[in-house]
A protein has these predicted regions:
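Structural/interface elements that position substrates and couple domains in central-metabolism enzymes
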Residues: 1-446
């Protein structure tokens, strides 16, 4: 992981992908990196924060504090601006913006189109552009490439180079998943691929596989669709186990004793930027650019099953309260954890919002708690656990933050109005909770 080539690198989009990628690249000799970030009301604070050498992630991110201080303050190799004019001096431009889907499951490329156009205005001959945002298969060549060519007056493959290389980052392991995971790189032509591989070799320790741009796009969306389908199986089996009166985690242990089996963990729902929408990106790609239509029934059903899990958690809450003679309408419910992933501050597509919405729709008063999340737009959120739990009729665990494993059940029972605990992430041992005097319900535990 060394660089003998001097590169001016621009990374557009300072989020969970762009920031660690930019910082790692800036840590390599010969690299100078500029991040581009909008000064929006939601994310504009990151500009000054990063330029002060601070890690903007509130979750546990090993190595990030030290890396940010080193590349910003010591090496002065990384800073952030909102001015796209920095693209005119770039040798490499990475695009790391969100690519959500709308309520009709159609990709919304407003940000991708905008940044492609703005970067394209400053594009010079010889520049390498890499799309790291997850996109529907066919997007790089059918949407991004024409925009770059139109705005720059240059031709991809002849005047500038274009590739797609998807991220595999996960909050809590942002740096590790970039440096120590295999990388897939696909360019629109051989030279684009070669240059992109050369770039990533400066920061990736594992194997880098070169392929076509379309194959790389398909690999990313299929990889996440595969995981989503496996999680859906586990979630459905969890409900089967509830019906049969057994513990799904015991069944999982028995199944996974066979070396070629890997039943995933069930839970309160699937979140994050990728899994809830990448199956739809895959389907959109084949629907739009494929030679013929493919129903893609399995991935659609998996999405439906996983989307039902937050509502199932609410049903378990209703059942547990009823056992105590409490109705949900008018009850106070503490929702514990709003990040989609444990010990992170990432709330993108978090199942917690679906849980809260369903509870409130049924008349509950909800206070959410999370030790890492700053705010959750439109929802009452506190970092004070006692505020959430004081006088609560039920505590519902949505995220398995380490903090919740250490909850003092006796103290919890003392401050809650009704000792009801609903576990969406297998945080507690059922027997221990019930022995402490709680009514307990959990996903997958009959």
């Amino acid at each position: 992981m060394t660089s003998k080539t001097k590169r001016n690198i621009v990374v557009i989009g300072m989020g969970y992908v762009g920031i660690p990628a930019a910082a790692l690249l800036a840590d390599m000799p010969g690299h100078t990196v500029v991040g581009v970030q909008r000064r929006s009301s939601r994310s504009g604070w990151k500009i000054d924060w990063i330029n002060a050498g601070k890690n903007p992630f509130e979750g546990d991110e090993p190595g990030m504090d030290e890396l940010m201080a080193r590349v910003v303050l010591d090496k002065k190799a990384f800073h952030v601006t909102d001015d796209y004019a920095v693209c005119q001096d770039a040798d490499v431009i990475l695009i790391d913006v969100q690519t959500p889907t709308d309520t009709n499951r159609i990709p919304q490329y407003v940000s991708l189109r905008e940044v492609s156009a703005r970067a394209g205005k400053y594009l010079r001959p010889g520049v390498l552009v890499v799309i790291e945002s997850t996109v529907a298969p066919g997007t790089t060549q059918n949407i991004v490439q024409p925009i770059l060519e139109k705005e720059s007056g240059l031709q991809a493959g002849a005047d500038f180079f274009l590739a797609f290389s998807y991220e595999r980052v996960m909050p809590g392991k942002l740096l590790e998943y970039i440096t120590d995971f295999p990388r897939v790189v696909g360019g629109i032509d051989e030279e684009s691929t070669r240059r992109a591989v050369e770039l990533y070799r400066t920061i990736v320790r594992k194997e880098i596989t070169a392929t076509s741009v379309l194959a790389a796009e398909l690999a990313k969306t299929m990889e996440n669709a595969y995981r989503d389908v496996n999680i859906a199986f586990s979630n459905e089996m969890a409900r089967v186990c509830e019906s049969m009166g057994v513990d799904v985690y015991e069944i999982r242990r028995l199944m996974n004793a066979r070396p070629d089996r890997n039943m995933h963990l069930p839970g309160a729902g699937v979140g994050g930027h990728c899994l809830p929408k990448d199956s739809w990106l895959l389907k959109f790609g084949v629907d739009t650019y494929g030679k013929f239509q493919v129903p893609a029934r399995m991935i659609a059903l998996a999405r439906e099953i996983n989307d039902e899990m937050p509502l199932h958690l609410v049903d378990l809450t209703v059942q547990a309260l009823a056992e105590r003679g409490v109705v949900l309408d008018g009850a106070k419910v503490a929702v514990l954890g709003v990040a989609y992933l444990e010990d992170s501050d990432d709330t993108r597509n978090t199942p917690a919002t679906a849980v809260i919405d369903a509870l409130q729709h049924k008349g509950a008063s909800v206070v959410a708690h999370d030790p890492y999340v700053r705010d959750l737009d439109g929802y009452e959120l506190t970092r004070d656990l006692d505020v959430a739990l004081q006088g609560a009729d039920a505590a519902v665990i949505v995220t398995r933050h380490r903090l919740y494993y250490d909850l003092d059940l006796a103290r919890l029972k003392g401050i809650m109005r009704a000792p009801v605990l609903v576990d969406g992430r297998n945080v507690f041992d059922a027997e221990a909770v019930r022995s402490a005097g709680f009514t307990y319900r959990a996903i997958g535990k009959g």
